[in-house]
Amino acid sequence: MELIFLGTSAGVPTRTRNVTAILLNLQHPTQSGLWLFDCGEGTQHQLLHTAFNPGKLDKIFISHLHGDHLFGLPGLLCSRSMSGIIQPLTIYGPHGIREFVETALRISGSWTDYPLEIVEIGAGEIFDDGLRKVTAYPMEHPLECYGYRIEEHDKPGALNAQALKAAGVPPGPLFQELKAGKTIMLDDGRQINGADYLAAPVPGKALAIFGDTGPCDAALELAKGVDVMVHEATLDMAMEAKANSRGHSSTRQAAALAREAGVGKLIITHVSSRYDDKGCQHLLRECRSIFPATELANDFAVFSI
């Protein structure tokens, strides 16, 4: 998997940062796998500066209904339709997302020529497609808001083909059954258990993408042990009280959570427009003083998971 940040500014865009939107490229060889987390104004313009086509999008996750996370959605939906894209799209978001989308399309005389499903969510598991599952956790914010935990299922270990051939198992369809952990019977009556010829499973990756939030009860469970945690760092340590009063977090709080949760990497985003490049480096230094494995997201930055 890889993350592509399309927008990293909080509240309003700046000359170098658009408002919030994050692409998750699942990099699955046989299935569509491009997900979008939040869709601030101008997201479709940001997409034009990447190698990704909106037609590859099959899921959009909205954290909450504040405009800097949402106002780019109607335009993206319409442009996707005007481009002749017919691939189905599912939108997940809090209560009100259906009314917002349907109203925007209706009063603008717009529609989609592709199947569009809108799912209003609550806390808990959203779906499990057999390859990965997504779970929503409630955030601490003035509006109903969610963070998302994406967990890949463990992958089967490699099949020891050499040992199977030595045991007299012919390559072909039987190998596929054994790869699935099944037991087969050979023509000579011997039973071969696939589990005996599989290496240990390959652990799946886990990712936590937080919505806007101050310190909250669900944060540790959402982030626990993930490979990558994406968290806002709207303001610096000195302005922590102001950040919390508006349902946001400081650099210290994001980094302390990453340390407590035992994450592999922290990526901070949703930076207040008050910070220029020098100020953003100050935010990064504050985080790294607590959790060294911290990166600062810039627009179009790409991170492998």
From Swiss-Prot:
GO terms for molecular function: 3'-tRNA processing endoribonuclease activity; exonuclease activity; zinc ion binding. This is Ribonuclease BN. Zn(2+) 2 binds at residues 68-69, 212, 270. The gene is rbn. Zinc phosphodiesterase, which has both exoribonuclease and endoribonuclease activities. The keyword Nuclease applies. SUPFAM superfamilies: Metallo-hydrolase/oxidoreductase. Belongs to the RNase Z family. RNase BN subfamily. Its cofactor is Zn(2+). The keyword Magnesium does not apply. The active site is at 68 (proton acceptor). It holds the Pfam family Lactamase_B_2. Its EC number is 3.1.-.-. Homodimer.
